[in-house]
UniProtKB/Swiss-Prot annotation:
Function: Seems to be involved in the morphogenesis of the polyhedra. Forms extensive fibrillar structures in both nucleus and cytoplasm. It is involved in the liberation of polyhedra from infected-insect cell.
UniProt name for this protein: Protein p10
Flavoprotein recorded as keyword: no
InterPro entries (UniProt xref): NPV_P10
Pfam family, one: NPV_P10
Keyword ATP-binding: no
Amino acid sequence: MSKPSILQQILTAVQDVDTKVDALQAQLTELDGKVQPLDGLSEQLTALDTKVTTIQDILGGAEVPDVPLPDNPLNKTRSRK
């Protein structure tokens, strides 16, 4: 059996590298999809910490702070036609 030419060896090596790069790109794309939902996590954790602190203060006997109530569509008056 004859030894493959140098050009064939280079082509095979390039194809191997290309396959590895494609696999790495797929892993990076998958990782990016998992990381994007974490972008707003810091703000969410800060808001949660504030709420937990407020609850702890209330349970500890502190004065209840004025907290704006969220809009509740069930409490709105409905017009009858």
